[in-house]
């Protein structure tokens, strides 16, 4: 079967909740996301702004161990690793994970841990 050269691969990015304590309400959105190759996207991790210590972002590919992407500790923190970046707002209680120009190798589960 001949492939259509105009059909762009579809990336599937999963976003799951991982929190240290059941007392903490950490919310992530969206839970799953389908992105066209080359498109940019972002995930949100919301957390209680009180008792903040650190927020961790991980990337987890099937059959591999989770890879630590960023540890966010300071309000206004901005970190970058290639096409992936993250920002932190401890006063409002959220962090964004951005993926610029998505590629097939970005297909993974992205985790936020508080």
From Swiss-Prot:
Primary location class: membrane
List of glycosylated residues: 42
Keywords (A to Z) from UniProt: Adaptive immunity, Cell membrane, Disulfide bond, Glycoprotein, Immunity, Immunoglobulin domain, Membrane, Receptor, Signal, T cell receptor
One term under GO cellular component: T cell receptor complex
Residue ranges of domain Ig-like in the record: 23-114
Positions of disulphide bridges: 45-112
PROSITE patterns named in the record: IG_LIKE
Function, in words: V region of the variable domain of T cell receptor (TR) alpha chain that participates in the antigen recognition. Alpha-beta T cell receptors are antigen specific receptors which are essential to the immune response and are present on the cell surface of T lymphocytes. Recognize peptide-major histocompatibility (MH) (pMH) complexes that are displayed by antigen presenting cells (APC), a prerequisite for efficient T cell adaptive immunity against pathogens.
Subunit structure comment from the entry: Alpha-beta TR is a heterodimer composed of an alpha and beta chain; disulfide-linked. The alpha-beta TR is associated with the transmembrane signaling CD3 coreceptor proteins to form the TR-CD3 (TcR or TCR). The assembly of alpha-beta TR heterodimers with CD3 occurs in the endoplasmic reticulum where a single alpha-beta TR heterodimer associates with one CD3D-CD3E heterodimer, one CD3G-CD3E heterodimer and one CD247 homodimer forming a stable octameric structure. CD3D-CD3E and CD3G-CD3E heterodimers preferentially associate with TR alpha and TR beta chains, respectively.
UniProt name for this protein: T cell receptor alpha variable 24
Gene: TRAV24
Localization terms from the record: Cell membrane
GO BP annotations listed: adaptive immune response; response to bacterium
Pfam families documented for this protein: V-set
Cleavable signal peptide: 1-22
Alphabetized InterPro entries for the sequence: Ig-like_dom, Ig-like_dom_sf, Ig-like_fold, Ig_V-set, TCR_variable_domain
